A protein has these predicted regions:
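Contiguous surface segments at macromolecular interaction interfaces
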Residues: 1-8, 14-20, 24-30, 66-134
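Short coil-to-beta transition motif at edge beta-strands of beta-rich domains
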Residues: 32-45
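Short beta-strand or tight-loop elements
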Residues: 37-39, 54, 84
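Short, charged beta-turn/beta-strand-edge "cap" motif at the junction between a beta-strand
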Residues: 45-51
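Short beta-strand-centered aromatic/proline hotspots
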Residues: 52-61
Length: 134
């Protein structure tokens, strides 16, 4: 199996991921790309943070679960969506400015992070280097 690395966005004004990961290392996430079990997911917190804060691994895919059961939604309109989910398990929490949007952009990020992005080339090399040194 070929492992893919992704950056995915999380808007902390819509979903309280920090609280969710305080209570458990596992979180259900919208399956809006072709994630496979074993893929690595770097979670980028947008508004107010603008940096990668978490590294997770996909442990299950194609899950049907009601978002209403998730108490960490701030934006209740998003909570009501019925979407396929994946189960992510947190591997690491980052507390470094080295994974900020500006430095990601300087190291190969070509666009804003509004959806899943496959890590490739110089951006992948940069994120992996910071990850290994944290």
């Amino acid at each position: 199996m070929n492992q893919t690395e992704w950056i995915i966005p999380c808007n902390p004004q819509s979903y309280n991921l920090q609280a969710a990961l305080t209570n458990s290392d596992e979180v259900y996430w919208r399956q809006n790309a072709r994630y496979e079990i074993g893929d690595i997911i770097y979670i980028y917190l947008s508004k107010g943070v603008s940096a990668i804060r978490y590294k997770a691994i996909v442990i299950r895919t194609d899950i049907e679960i009601k978002s209403e059961d998730d108490p960490y939604w701030i934006d209740k309109t998003m909570q009501s969506q019925k979407l396929q989910k994946v189960l992510l398990k947190r591997i690491k929490t980052f507390n470094t400015a080295l994974l900020s949007y500006d430095l990601l952009k300087e190291n190969g990020l070509k666009s804003t992070i509004q959806g899943p992005i496959k890590l490739k080339g110089s951006l992948r090399d940069y994120v992996n280097r910071i990850d290994q040194n944290q």
